[in-house]
Amino acid sequence: PTWSTSFSTSCVIPALVRAKELGWAVDEKVLARAVRYVEQCKLPGGAVMYDIRPIPRRPGESIDNVKGSLGRMQVANWALRRARSPGVTDDVIRAALEDFFEHHQFLDVARMRPIPHEAYYANAAYFYMFAHCYAAQVINELPESERAAWHKRLRAHLAKVQWD
């Protein structure tokens, strides 16, 4: 392929890592390239770019802002942690989760919007459950003693969107 997104690549990395752990044939170059790509998508301040472009998107209210990458931050950190990337420490995971909860209203606004990326910071409805799924995964990468408190915060956001 000639184009990929940070979040689709991040979804594949843990599967490749697990396949390798199970003894399945995994092309090391493919895995290393995927990890490198996601690492390159990470920006100072914790945001994760949607994709890598020769000409970056304009800064500000961009999809590549922390507020526009709340879900991508979680899946990227989870994937890179599973791949044992040294840059994803517990503190990096905690900071991204804090951003997730601090700016959650931008996911809330986008949740029921019918047109992708029409909400603030180009958030899309399809990122809502995606973001929560991978927040749960990355919480499980933290020390066990911390997980219950993080999951409790996450559950509150999922419970509020459940129907009777």
Report residues per predicted region:
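TPR/TPR-like (Sel1-like) alpha-helical repeat modules
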Residues: 20, 158-159
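An alpha-helical repeat/solenoid feature that recognizes helix-turn-helix modules
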Residues: 1-32, 40-153, 164
